[in-house]
């Protein structure tokens, strides 16, 4: 609250400064008490105002915390783009693996069709003669149900 200046005036014809200052203080005191009576709130009003003030403070603090935890539009867009890129990469790798599986199956079928063991009914092992005359055994090992692998042993 701003402090009000005390009334300082000297009435005409009075030379007694002490009495004049006492009168000024009395008048100033009366003015102050009257002002306080007008400004003074009831207990109910004071409690209500205090509750409103605390609620506003609480709302401000919770808004600050929410603002800190909330992602901005740029951050949201960035994370959506990351997710989109991740999905595209997964699709690309899935297609790559499908293509490689197809190539593998094609080579496997070619090897099986050339194999003399085809008639004996052994699809797991293959033998073939190379130019140097050595015999190699090709063994199919299924490590993953979706991707069998060829292992060549001499």
Swiss-Prot record:
Residues 125-135 have a biased composition (Polar residues). GO terms for cellular component: chromosome, telomeric region; nucleus. It holds the Pfam family FAM192A_Fyv6_N. Residues 1-30, 48-68, 98-154 are annotated as: Disordered. It comes from the Eukaryota. Residues 16-26, 58-68, 98-108 have a biased composition (Basic and acidic residues). It is found in: Nucleus; Chromosome, Telomere. Keywords: Chromosome, Nucleus, Telomere. Residues 140-154 have a biased composition (Basic residues). Belongs to the FYV6 family. Involved in telomere length regulation and promotes fully efficient non-homologous end-joining (NHEJ) by a mechanism activated in postdiauxic/stationary phase. This is Protein FYV6. The lineage of its organism: Eukaryota, Fungi, Dikarya, Ascomycota, Saccharomycotina. The gene is FYV6.
